[in-house]
From Swiss-Prot:
Pathway terms, separated by semicolons: Polyol metabolism; glycerol degradation via glycerol kinase pathway; sn-glycerol 3-phosphate from glycerol: step 1/1
Organism: Clostridium botulinum (strain Alaska E43 / Type E3)
Keyword Transcription: no
Activity regulation remarks: Activated by phosphorylation and inhibited by fructose 1,6-bisphosphate (FBP).
Family: Belongs to the FGGY kinase family.
Keyword Ribosomal protein: no
Alphabetical list of Pfam families matching this protein: FGGY_C (PF02782), FGGY_N (PF00370)
Record's protein name: Glycerol kinase
Catalytic activity from the UniProt record: glycerol + ATP = sn-glycerol 3-phosphate + ADP + H(+)
Any one Gene Ontology molecular-function term assigned to this protein's record: ATP binding
Residues that bind glycerol: 82-83, 135, 245-246
Gene3D superfamilies, A to Z: 3.30.420.40
SUPFAM superfamilies in alphabetical order: Actin-like ATPase domain
Length: 498
């Protein structure tokens, strides 16, 4: 048994490789950003070959800079941006089109047509746990087949394969030998029946997707195949853990108990609550998804997705050029006592849960002559907490109880002003763990459990510990006034682009 597990964390803006030891210490990290492609308004793409080269590059780099040899690696786990859709030629290994990213809204028109069939929309929700939306993979595959020359003909001949990013990476790591996904990633395609645990023929046929394109669905923790680290003749290392980034974060936060929840503050924000073996269908705009599948035992989760979370700070930095570094946002936000009545609604690509409005667009409200750069920066930061609070409110109604506490992770969870405002506006205890790399840690856990590197979930759970706790300080009247202002702002951006 080797001394380490490697997590490959393929995110929306960068690829990372993180090495953990048995005590969950981070031994090494390598990261590489890659190109964001915006061909038209509302469209977002990545180059699948750049995803692969950046991910494989950081794997090689982290091993080199830590002087860890391949035979010291017990297993590789993969976590990935979900829903992002790649279609490639199985004979040449070449993608037929760029990866269509989860944020991309190009299939909104396809979704509108599908929504005209009320019975089908209800069927999708009841069987996939998802809502008909451009966010998920199904309509993205259809778009590629309908719009890339020769793609449909190739697909019908059985020459094309579909995969979310996890599937693509495993296929590349195994030199095209293994075409698989796991339960969690399958549950984000809008093609997978999460009750019966199978690809849903009714939905697949409605979208015109040949079943030969679809990967085999496996557990989130099992050996899928091996990769040669060090090239041909190198050490064969098992790839033995795989889950979507948000499910990995839930697992990495050791939210193993029914009712436990976490929020990840990344490019978007993603709130997940473990509902155990109960598949709870939301009445409040959330989606139902698979939390994890181990030994063919499925646990479900309620999920709310915010499309633009930390990305609003990138916008403040890159487009408005108010700050030089994302970390500066807290410094400038603290220069004013409050938002000065200013609200930023960052609906750049529509609104996710609980609104699900593909046609909403971003806006800044409440500007007066006294409003300055710092008010806008603060309002942008606060928008992340307001959107999360919308999810918490919906989740409490669906679950029938208020969350006692919220475990947090992701880059923006290190922002103390944001975390305190989250506790205040949500009237909830916010807990940041010592290890905030919970997404990568979850992938490492899943891989390690499959090969005996860690013995059990119980062993893992004992390692979770709080770094900082934030308690609510607002009076209820202040909280209600601020939330009312936010709701007013959101109401004005809905349907803007119709």
């Amino acid at each position: 048994m080797g001394k380490y597990v490697v997590a490959l964390d393929q995110g929306t803006t960068s690829s990372r490789a993180i090495i953990f030891d048995k005590e969950q210490n981070i031994v090494g990290v390598s990261q590489k950003e890659f190109t964001q492609i915006y061909p038209h308004e509302g469209w977002v793409e990545h180059n699948p070959l750049e995803i692969w080269s950046s991910q494989y590059g950081v794997l090689q780099e982290v091993l080199a800079k830590t002087n860890i040899t391949a035979d010291e690696i017990s297993a590789i786990g993969i976590t990935n941006q979900r829903e992002t859709t790649i279609v490639w030629d199985k004979n040449t290994g070449e993608p037929v089109y760029n990866a269509i990213v989860w944020q991309c809204r190009r299939t909104a028109g396809i979704v509108d047509e599908l929504k005209k069939d009320d019975e089908f929309a209800e069927y999708v929700k009841a069987n996939t746990g998802l809502l008909l939306d451009a966010y998920f993979s199904g309509t993205k595959i259809k778009w590629i087949l309908d719009n890339v020359e020769g793609a449909r003909e190739k697909a019908e001949k059985g020459d094309l394969l579909f995969g979310t990013v996890d599937t693509w990476l495993v296929w590349k790591l195994t030199n095209g030998k293994v075409h698989v996904t796991d339960y969690t990633n399958a549950s984000r395609t809008m093609l997978y029946n999460i009750k019966e645990l199978r690809w849903d023929e009714k939905i697949i046929n409605k979208l015109g997707i040949p079943t030969s394109m679809l990967p085999e669905v496996k557990n989130s923790s099992e050996v899928y195949g091996h990769t040669n680290l060090g090239g041909v003749g190198g050490v064969r290392v098992p790839i033995s853990g795989m889950a979507g980034d948000q499910q990995c974060a839930l697992f990495g936060q050791t939210c193993f108990e029914k009712g436990s929840a976490k929020n990840t503050y990344g490019t978007g924000c993603f709130l997940l609550m473990n509902t155990g073996e109960d598949m709870v269908l939301s009445k409040n705009g959330l989606v139902t998804t698979i939390a994890v599948g181990i030994n063919d035992k499925i646990e479900y989760a309620l999920e709310g997705s915010v499309f633009v979370g930390g990305a609003v700070i990138q916008w403040i930095r890159d487009e408005l050029q108010f700050i030089h570094d994302a970390a500066d946002s807290e410094y400038f936000a603290k220069k004013v006592e409050d938002n000065g009545g200013v609200y930023v609604v960052p609906a750049f690509v529509g609104l996710g849960a609980p609104y699900w409005d593909m046609y909403a667009r971003g806006a800044i409200f409440g500007l007066t002559r006294g409003a300055n750069r710092n008010h806008i920066i603060r309002a942008a930061l606060e928008s992340i907490a307001y959107q999360t609070n919308d999810l918490l409110t919906a989740m409490a109604e669906d679950a029938g109880c208020k969350l006692a506490s919220l475990r947090v992770d992701g880059g923006a969870s290190r922002n103390d002003l944001l975390m305190q405002f989250q506790a205040d506006i949500s009237n909830t205890q916010v807990l940041r763990p010592i290890i905030t790399e919970t997404t990568a840690l979850g992938a490492a856990y899943l891989a390690g459990l499959a090969v005996g590197f860690w013995e059990s979930k119980e062993e893992i759970a004992t390692k979770w510990a709080v770094s900082k706790s934030y308690g609510p300080t607002f009076e209820s009247a202040k909280r209600e006034k601020l939330n009312k202002g936010w709701k007013n702002a959101v109401s004005r951006v809905k349907g803007w682009a119709e």
